[in-house]
């Protein structure tokens, strides 16, 4: 099986290692791990700029944790893979709410307060409250709710119909 995309590499990484250092970009870390799968990366280096670590918690899933070991958020999963970063951010989940985090630092940049959220594209994302996820077993989609478009800082650009 060939692992070409960043999310496929993240899946491989999570399967192979329970935690990892966020000292390089995630992409650089995935490449490093693919080059040497036996390499052991420590979670938090003393001089690291980064404040978070990915950790696979058995029977709970993949979490981003802080230096104290607190669960901060979970990456949002789409099509059975962690969400890919777009426009410098990726979707996150805190409880049942969706927000966005910076792809390089892991810092939350838009609070997890939405029930539904599409990835950013060209600097904006459609997000909704009061919407619900429906599925046919293979595909899923959101229905209902109030939707708005936001910029990468979380500011409302326009009200919108469901995308």
Label each PLM-derived region with a short phrase.
Residues 2-11:
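Bacterial N-terminal signal peptides that target proteins for export
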Residues 2-3, 18-21:
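Position-driven detector of the extreme protein N-terminus
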Residues 11-19:
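Bacterial N-terminal signal peptides
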Residues 24-163:
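Residue-level detector of conserved, function-critical positions
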